[in-house]
Amino acid sequence: MFDLLQQTSRSFAVSIPMLPNPIREEVALAYLLFRVADTIEDEGSFTPEARSEMLTDWIDSVRTCSTEGTEHWSDFSSIPHSGYVALMEARRSLIERLKSLPLPHRELIHQYLAKTVAGMDQFLVKNDAWHDVGELREYCYYVAGVVGEMLTAMFTSYDRRLLPAEDELMRLAPSVGESLQLVNMIRDYQTDNERQRLYFSEAISFDDLLALATESIESAREFLDILFRYEAQPGIVAFNAFNFSLAERALQNAKSLGHYKLDRADVRMATQSIRAV
């Protein structure tokens, strides 16, 4: 499972192993289940209607712990990213791992993935660019903010020291995922613009994107501060500190250096920033 993580997300392949077990395994599995949905949504070689049907198949598979409804899916070898091809081919083994989790843990993952899939489907049906900042914010919530909520539910369930701060953490939880989503959009903005693949309407400027990312990162900072204040389990703090550091550095690069990519030095600095945790 962790080899799939390395093939599909360089940043989470670093941060998820920082978590303690058993939550480490569950977060890794949940990430990959969400990543399957992301891959379906992003696969432009399928029509929006076909992708919508596949998303329904996938959430049914997660709910029932059976891949019977996905057996008719097409070959994904045309996907240019080999890691995503491997992920799609591994969906049966992912569902088998999910089946081994306690029922409440399976239900939690399904609950949040169902919310994300419903949001993805809503935007697939529209099949149009985001018309304003409100729509962009809503999209980011469904595809990333919900992940932050799921992670927070996992953290507070695992580490009872966080229970007194649960309401405050859940209020800020969407920012944990949205900050990463927004800096990914910033990172890809230049390339997408060059390839004429932008999904923004003219009503959304690059400055709007920077402003949303800045706001989200400030909320993620508050989230991290609460983890420190309540002396959360060190691995949970390290996971969040690493992801926050990467997002913050990517935003700083975009604002001050005029480029959007993170290189190995950025990842190394993010790792060094949490070694004291």
Give a label for each model feature.
Residues 1-180, 186-277:
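Catalytic cores of Mg2+-dependent Asp-rich isoprenoid enzymes
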